[in-house]
Design a protein with these regions (language model features):
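Active-site segments of SGNH/GDSL-like serine hydrolases
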Residues: 124-130, 148-180
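Cell-envelope and extracellular/periplasmic
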Residues: 22-29, 60, 94-100, 124-134, ...
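Serine-esterase "nucleophile elbow" of acetyl-processing enzymes
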Residues: 22-94, 111-117
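N-terminal signal peptide c-region/cleavage motif recognized by signal peptidases
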Residues: 15-17
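Catalytic His-Asp segment of secreted/periplasmic serine-dependent ester chemistry enzymes
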Residues: 165-252
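Bacterial N-terminal signal peptides that target proteins for export
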Residues: 1-7
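Oxyanion-hole/transition-state-stabilizing segment in secreted/luminal serine hydrolases
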Residues: 42, 54, 61-62, 88, ...
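Structural recognition of the beta-strand scaffold that forms the well-ordered cores
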Residues: 52-57, 91-96, 121-127, 158-163, ...
Length: 252
């Protein structure tokens, strides 16, 4: 890996921070997307100039319509990272199923990891919405998260957790905040980065950046939200990789 280190360090310096260059509606305070933990497997993948990502979760990760998968944030994440990482081949694949909760996602993890080619260096796990709707026991939910993260790490990949979407229409009916706190706690205990989609979208709603009351009815708003999520998630991945730069120099 020694010969790749100069390329890697130059690449990460070139890649960010990029949130100031995003469309104005996408910009948020830097602390909302600053990772607490590194992504060592992503660093190795960048050094090899080939980054494969598996996005797994429920149907909320995609958009409706014939072009839904193309316009949703997983596809946009691939585009954003490709732009930010010149010289790196980026591939994002999805394993998404409607109404899939945490326990069901854990059962799907091993087959999804085995099916993804090349083997993913990173798993982006969107979680919380379905569990909140189904009122899954929070302890069972946390246990499933722990188990799933261990499966991914055993397969040689990093994990980024993404909590639920914020929706002012359902906030009073579904305890999304409760599950968001459990996700945050598990992320801290497991030392994995958390992309706090819930807080970011709540900020947008509070500021009037996006009319999230009508987002379910207006596809153009949903597409813009997904575009911003992809851009900010790409930033988090890059920043988390930078946290592991000393290990890259030592050949970890």
């Amino acid at each position: 890996m020694t010969g790749r280190v100069p390329f890697l360090l130059a690449l990460l310096m070139l890649a960010g921070p990029a949130w100031a260059e995003h469309p104005a509606e996408c910009r948020v305070a830097a602390n909302l997307i600053e990772p607490d933990f590194p992504l060592p497997q992503v660093v190795r993948a960048l050094a090899a100039k080939r980054l494969s990502i598996l996005v797994i979760g429920s149907g909320s990760m995609l958009l409706p319509g014939a072009d839904g998968s193309k316009n949703a944030y997983p596809a946009r994440l691939q585009h954003a990272l490709t732009e930010m990482l010149p010289g790196v081949e980026v591939k994002v694949v999805t394993d998404v199923q409607a109404h899939r909760n945490a326990v069901e996602t854990v059962k799907a993890l091993k087959p999804a990891l085995a099916a993804a080619k090349p083997a993913p260096a990173l798993v982006v796990w969107g979680i919380g919405t379905v569990d909140a709707i189904q009122a899954i026991d929070p302890d069972q939910f946390s246990h499933a998260l722990d188990h799933g993260i261990n499966i991914v790490h055993s397969a040689g990949a990093d994990v980024v957790l993404i909590n639920a979407q914020y929706s002012p229409r359902t906030e009073s009916m579904i305890a999304l905040g409760t599950y968001a706190e459990h996700i945050r706690w598990v992320a801290l205990q497991q030392k994995v980065p958390l992309f706090d989609r819930f807080s970011i979208m709540k900020l947008w709603a509070d500021l009037g950046t996006f009319d999230l009351y009508s987002a379910t009815k207006k596809l153009d708003i949903a597409e813009r939200v997904h575009d911003c999520i992809a851009r900010l998630l790409a930033d988090l991945v890059i920043e988390a990789a930078k946290l592991d730069e000393p290990h890259a120099e030592s050949g970890r």
